[in-house]
Curated annotation (Swiss-Prot):
Residues engaged in binding ATP: G209, P210, P211, G212, T213, G214, K215, T216
Gene: ftsH
Official protein name in the record: ATP-dependent zinc metalloprotease FtsH
Pfam family, one: AAA
Molecular function via GO: ATP binding; ATP hydrolysis activity; ATP-dependent peptidase activity; metalloendopeptidase activity; zinc ion binding
Gene Ontology biological process terms in this record: protein catabolic process; proteolysis
Enzyme category, top tier: hydrolase
Length: 638
């Protein structure tokens, strides 16, 4: 534990101890010093009780002023009671009466305190302790890092000097976004160069992109490079259970920023506070909307915020309020997308620093194997590989650990404890061999990386393809048809080898994928000859954003029936192509399946060697076999 943590712990313990002492002192003062209750009687009544034998002891107290008081222990109503009597000056007759009746007599002086002494003894210690407790609470409240009672204060972390130890050299693969933010930092450092041309500093920069692409990392790099105060806060930290806290924290944040201008304010996950106002089924959220209104005012309201640059990050730009996105508030919207091949290679090089890699590790090959991976995915991938190497008591990270880490990240860990019967192993082998065979024989399809029958996650076996990211997200009609054909290869292999009555549920996810692709081809991509180049059906939107209350079907029942027919036609064509390839290459299918049963995993090079050493029948280049009319369980709503 740090010294600061120890001091805070001891301070808390001291607070509780002081509070306990105060409570005990107050209880002692007001409860412990109460004198016993006494019954006051007359002098003659006392003499009568002494003569009747009801008094056993008399204590005579003499005050400094000469006044005497007798305190007697008498029995009244069959109960022992203390009585008090104001006495005249003592006479021998009173003493003789007491002695004659066997009453014990004692005399003592009374030491009375003055008024000031009584006040001090009664109130001084409690008041002193309460004052000490008050000052201790004030000190704890205003201490560093303590927000015990300051609900309306901003919780932003402030860096007056760079402390993140991260610079733009640690950011790779997102060069365009890095350039935009580097320009903002340069504006703060060398503003004269820009103002000489009449340029104004941008008010805000919004970083938009999928999770894990490096938005927060960019902000940390800005904090390390800027050379100006850097305030960082999460959007969720503005709103609490108390009304008005969010707006108060926004005001306090920008008040601190104005005092330290020029500076940078970074708001992470701004969608937590910047959602559209008054949207959704449940109406608006008054507290969040009040916070958003205050944020809008501070960013570009009646009073300027010159010298303050707001950088915000979100992966949900579609839910943000339009007033927040306009120029003057967020002048720049920087898209931080998934990296391409070159970006992935640079990211891998950055995260490979400090890791001991063996000579066989090829980062370029790994970058080609991981299209669609974000920077966070790649960092996690190399970390998993390092953990696997340590688990295996190795001194270096080899390509085997990296390959296993890729499989682990994509599909989960191997289920080595799951014992499979020979029948199940053979069935899974034929299913995966069907995918691999069809994918290998289709023209211009993605190359196969690996085929395995070792279960991972929810899958009993997997066939890994290596998609290319050169097409920039564009997919052709031919490739979509090939995707459906490959997905149906496993079901067709089961049917060809074991018969229609022995097909299994292992193709459930394949059928869902096929139905989804076919329906999108018909209704979204305009790839149906009968329906033409039209997009049918309004797309679903998140109903809690106020965009759509329900999906609307903008076509007739006849068109809906035609859509179903076209979906079934596309699926049947893909099924027919897969059936043709597997029936015509049955011997090759058996060879691949037998090898899978033996080795459990074969890589793409070994699979290609098996295909090269076998007789192969390809699809006819011009005409395809007649479509088969087969009953298929196609989820038309997928």
């Amino acid at each position: 534990m740090s010294q600061k943590g120890k001091n805070k712990k001891w301070r808390s313990a001291g607070l509780y101890a002081l509070l306990a002492i105060v409570l005990i002192s107050l209880a002692t003062t007001f409860l412990g010093n109460r004198p016993p209750e006494r019954l006051e009687i007359s002098y003659s009544d006392l003499i009568s009780r002494v003569e009747r034998g009801e008094v056993s002891k008399v204590l005579v107290e003499t005050a400094p002023d000469g006044r005497q008081v007798a305190i007697a222990e008498a029995e009244i109503n069959n109960r022992a009671t203390q009585v008090q009597v104001n006495l005249p000056p003592l006479t021998p007759e009173f003493e003789n009466t007491l002695v004659a009746n066997g009453v014990e007599l004692a005399v003592r002086p009374v030491q009375e305190e003055g008024l000031l002494g009584r006040i001090l003894s009664t109130f001084f210690l409690p008041v002193l302790l309460l004052l000490g407790l008050f000052f201790l609470l004030r000190r704890a409240q205003n201490g560093p890092g303590s927000q015990a009672l300051n609900f309306g204060k901003s919780r932003a972390r402030v860096q007056m000097e760079p402390k993140t130890q991260i610079t733009f050299n640690d950011v790779a693969g997102i060069d365009q976004a890095k350039l935009e933010l580097a320009e903002v930092v340069d504006f703060l450092k060398n503003s004269e160069r820009f103002t000489a041309l009449g340029a104004k500093i941008p008010r805000g920069v919004l970083l938009v992109g999928p999770p894990g692409t490096g938005k927060t990392l960019l902000a940390r790099a800005v904090a390390g490079e800027a050379g100006v105060p850097f305030f960082s806060i999460s959007g969720s930290e503005f709103v609490e259970m108390f009304v008005g806290v969010g707006a108060s924290r926004v005001r306090d944040l920008f008040e601190q920023a104005k005092q330290n201008a020029p500076c940078i304010v970074f708001i992470d996950e701004i969608d937590a506070v910047g959602r559209q106002r008054g949207a959704g089924l449940g109406g608006g959220n008054d507290e969040r909307e009040q916070t958003l209104n205050q944020l809008l005012t501070e960013m570009d309201g009646f009073e300027g915020n010159s010298g303050i640059i707001v950088i915000a990050a979100t992966n949900r730009p579609d839910v943000l309020d339009a007033a927040l996105l306009r120029p003057g508030r967020f002048d720049r919207q920087v898209t931080v997308d998934r990296p391409d091949f070159q970006g992935r290679l640079e990211i891998l090089k950055v995260h490979a620093r400090g890791k001991t890699l063996s000579a066989d590790v090829d980062l370029e090959k790994l970058a080609r194997r991981t299209p669609g991976f974000t920077g966070a995915d790649l960092a996690n991938l190399l970390n998993e590989a390092a953990i696997l190497a340590a688990r295996r008591n190795l001194t270096e990270i080899s390509m085997d650990e990296i390959n296993d880490a890729v499989d682990r990240v994509l599909a989960g860990p191997e289920k080595k404890d799951r014992l499979m019967s020979e029948r199940r192993k053979e069935l899974v082998a034929y299913h995966e061999a069907g995918h691999a065979l069809v994918g290998s024989l289709l023209p211009n399809y993605d190359p196969i990386q690996k085929v395995t029958i070792i279960p991972r996650g929810q899958a009993g076996g997997l066939t890994w393809f290596m998609p290319s990211d050169d097409d920039m997200g564009l997919t052709t009609r031919a490739h979509l048809k090939n995707m459906m054909t490959v997905a149906l290869g496993g079901r067709v292999a089961e049917e060809v080898v074991y018969g229609e009555s022995e097909i299994t549920t292992g193709a459930a996810s394949d059928l869902q994928q096929v139905a989804r692709i076919a329906r999108n081809m018909v209704t979204r991509f305009g790839m149906s000859d009968r329906l033409g180049n039209v997009a049918l059906g309004r797309q679903y939107a998140n109903i809690f954003l106020g965009r759509e209350i329900a999906a609307e079907r903008d076509f007739s029942e006849e068109t809906a029936a035609l859509i179903d027919e076209e979906v079934r036609r596309l699926v049947n064509e893909a099924y027919q192509r897969a059936t043709y390839l597997i029936r015509e290459n049955r011997a090759l299918l058996d060879r691949i399946a037998r090898r899978l049963v033996e080795a459990e995993t074969i890589d793409g090079e070994e699979l290609q060697a098996i295909i090269d050493n076998s007789e192969v029948v390809m699809l006819p280049p011009e005409e395809e076999p007649e479509p088969l009319t087969l009953p298929m369980a196609v989820n038309a709503g997928a």
